[in-house]
């Protein structure tokens, strides 16, 4: 991590940590306070319900007390009279009294008449609670509350119910009534939803205050970093271009020396040996054959030197322009490799600076080298054209293609691609590579800024 990154981290990290800590504490405190309030509210509601059903049970017992006290244990008439009274005690759609005997047989149930006369001792609710058995046990133990799930008459849905039961021990009866708790839970859920909304609102307010602060600090640091990086990139590109210019100058110098010095000398040697061969041929056949071979070798050396000279700096690029240089490059490439090579430059108008022409030529040259070494192609096509004053060039082959990340940016091929990209980047141009199993297409795009000034274009014309 660089010093600047460390400074940015020291500026942002403590701020982010403090914001997260404050937000977490506020959220936790709000959640605890709301939870405690909701729990208290729910407990108060349950206590109110408990008091309500206790009072209702006492009223029912008062209504049957006289009959029950006077009746015997087997007084069927009294039992029927008490059952009728309890059936008639109705308070709302979901308010009623029920009666079971100790064996689990239903005696009174105004809302579910199908239960009358049947044994429900083994009845269980969705939670697995043996409802009737538990109610009987609670009543035998002296009476009390029991919570379970039961069908709510007004909706037909299963809901939580809280019942209070007492026993009429002389008759072995269990008398009870209850209230449904879904309204309590609904109010608790609404309060809980309100609590979550308040916490979310608090979190949003904190975020609206703190996030911009972090963004301002981060943006300021990043702007400074990007500014310095842009300056460093500019300096690096300038240095890279100076290196490229130096290389071009050295190549041009070497090309001149090879062409004007060594090549001319070798041509002289060839003519001298040719003359010697003609003089010797009349007398000594072996000497003539040896000289002919020497001439052939010298011809090969001359051809190789000229090829090297062309690779280093083709004079045709300076003398005849980019189109002619690319045509010569295609011709020599096809002759050397046997790959069918075509060029189409019919739509190109040469308005580029000399340096831009060199850059496009070197891009094509490097692309040809990659095709020869790696692609295994049988066809190669070059297209050069102008689009609204912007030079464009594509180099396409039908080779194997490559993965631009794994293959194209590794080894010598990767260095070549980087060199091509740097050459284009110097002129603010683009280098696009589209590679697949069907082949590779390389597109070089020069901006208008790479063109010669208008007055120089007129002079060139």
UniProtKB/Swiss-Prot annotation:
UniProt-annotated location(s): Cell membrane
Function according to Swiss-Prot or TrEMBL: Member of the two-component regulatory system MctS/MctR, which activates mctP expression.
InterPro entries: HATPase_C_sf (IPR036890), sCache_2 (IPR033480), Sensor_HK_TwoCompSys (IPR050482), Sig_transdc_His_kin_sub3_dim/P (IPR011712), Sig_transdc_His_kinase_MctS (IPR017171)
Transmembrane regions: 7-27, 203-223
Enzyme Commission (EC) number: 2.7.13.3
Topology of the protein relative to the lipid bilayer: Multi-pass membrane protein
Ranges for domain Histidine kinase: 360-450
Pfam family, one: sCache_2
Entry protein name: Sensor histidine kinase MctS
GO cellular component: plasma membrane
Enzyme category, top tier: transferase
Modified residues (Phosphohistidine): 259
Reaction equations catalysed: ATP + protein L-histidine = ADP + protein N-phospho-L-histidine
Keywords: ATP-binding, Cell membrane, Kinase, Membrane, Nucleotide-binding, Phosphoprotein, Plasmid, Transferase, Transmembrane, Transmembrane helix, Two-component regulatory system
One Gene Ontology MF term: protein dimerization activity
């Amino acid at each position: 991590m660089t010093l600047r990154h460390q400074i940015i981290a020291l500026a942002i990290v403590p701020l982010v940590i403090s914001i997260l800590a404050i937000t977490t504490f506020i959220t936790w405190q709000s959640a605890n306070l709301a939870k405690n309030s909701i729990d208290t509210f729910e407990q108060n509601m349950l206590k109110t319900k408990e008091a309500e059903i206790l009072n209702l049970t006492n009223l029912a017992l008062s209504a049957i007390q006289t009959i029950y006290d006077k009746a015997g244990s087997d007084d069927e008439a009294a039992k029927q009279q008490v059952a009728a009274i309890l059936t008639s005690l109705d308070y709302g759609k979901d308010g009623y009294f029920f009666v079971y005997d100790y064996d689990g047989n239903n005696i009174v149930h105004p809302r579910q008449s199908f239960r009358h006369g049947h044994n429900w001792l083994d009845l269980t609710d969705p939670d697995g609670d043996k409802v009737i058995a538990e109610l009987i046990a609670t009543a035998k133990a002296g009476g009390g509350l029991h919570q379970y799930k039961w069908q709510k008459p007004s909706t037909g849905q299963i809901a939580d119910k809280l019942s209070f039961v007492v026993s009429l021990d002389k008759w072995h009866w269990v008398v009870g009534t209850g209230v449904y708790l879904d309204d309590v839970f609904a109010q608790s859920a609404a309060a809980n939803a309100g609590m979550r909304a308040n916490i979310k609102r608090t979190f949003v307010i904190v975020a609206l205050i703190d996030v911009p602060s972090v963004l301002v600090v981060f943006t300021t640091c990043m702007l400074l970093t990007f500014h310095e990086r842009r300056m460093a990139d500019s300096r690096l590109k300038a240095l890279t271009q100076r290196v490229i210019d130096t290389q071009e100058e050295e190549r041009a110098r070497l090309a001149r020396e090879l062409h004007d010095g060594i090549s001319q000398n070798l041509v002289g040697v060839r003519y001298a040996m040719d003359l010697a061969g003609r003089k010797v041929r009349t007398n000594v056949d072996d000497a003539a054959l040896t000289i002919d071979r020497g001439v052939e070798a010298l011809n090969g050396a001359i051809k190789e030197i000229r090829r090297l000279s062309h690779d280093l700096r083709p004079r045709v690029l300076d003398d005849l322009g980019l189109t002619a240089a690319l045509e010569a490059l295609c011709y020599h490439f096809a002759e050397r490799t046997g790959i069918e090579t075509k060029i189409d430059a019919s739509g190109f108008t040469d308005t580029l600076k000399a340096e831009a022409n060199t850059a496009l030529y070197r891009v094509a040259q490097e692309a040809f080298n990659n095709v020869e070494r790696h692609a295994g192609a049988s066809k190669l096509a070059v297209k050069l054209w102008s689009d609204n004053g912007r030079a464009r060039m594509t180099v396409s082959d039908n080779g194997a293609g490559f993965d631009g990340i794994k293959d194209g940016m590794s080894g010598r091929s990767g260095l070549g691609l980087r060199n091509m990209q740097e050459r284009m980047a110097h002129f603010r141009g683009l280098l696009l590579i589209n590679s697949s199993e069907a082949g590779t297409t390389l597109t070089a795009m020069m901006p208008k800024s790479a063109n010669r000034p208008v007055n120089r274009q007129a002079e060139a014309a």
